[in-house]
Curated annotation (Swiss-Prot):
GO terms for biological process: translation. This is Small ribosomal subunit protein uS12. The modification 3-methylthioaspartic acid is found at residue 89. It comes from Blochmanniella pennsylvanica (strain BPEN). With S4 and S5 plays an important role in translational accuracy. Interacts with and stabilizes bases of the 16S rRNA that are involved in tRNA selection in the A site and with the mRNA backbone. Located at the interface of the 30S and 50S subunits, it traverses the body of the 30S subunit contacting proteins on the other side and probably holding the rRNA structure together. The combined cluster of proteins S8, S12 and S17 appears to hold together the shoulder and platform of the 30S subunit. InterPro entries: NA-bd_OB-fold (IPR012340), Ribosomal_uS12 (IPR006032), Ribosomal_uS12_bac (IPR005679).
């Protein structure tokens, strides 16, 4: 255990924080342009074709972003908004596309958790 004199001479080092979403800087979301839209397969033991896109952000960085929900309208050169949030079974995917913002349409015929998928309230 350290003494008071030792702490006065040499203070304890502060722990450095490492961001999980470095491309966003300190921003909650960032705008970008789709460079490539494609599907990829997840790690074992899962099996699917996950929809992802390569995005060039306004700060010049290029990241891979996941497109959540059933179906999407994204093509190359589409302007999209991305947020942080990794996909556990896709290595290297640390960002999500915000559905219902800019060129990305919301999920059609979504009834529950609509706000997460950019779906308007259905006409009753």
């Amino acid at each position: 255990m350290t003494t008071v004199n030792q702490l006065v001479r040499n203070a304890r080092p502060t722990k450095t924080f490492k961001s999980n979403v470095p491309a966003l800087g300190a921003c909650p979301q960032k705008r970008g342009v789709c460079v490539r839209v494609y599907t990829t397969t997840p790690k074992k033991p899962n099996s699917a074709l996950r929809k992802v896109c390569r995005v060039r952000l306004t700060n010049g960085l290029e990241v891979t972003s996941y497109i959540g929900g059933e179906g999407h309208n994204l093509q190359e050169h589409a302007s999209i908004l991305i947020r942080g949030g990794r996909v556990k079974d896709l290595p290297g995917v640390r960002y999500h596309v915000v559905r219902g913002a800019l060129d990305c349409a919301g999920v059609h015929s979504r009834k529950k958790s609509r706000s997460k998928y950019g779906t308007k309230q259905p006409k009753s």
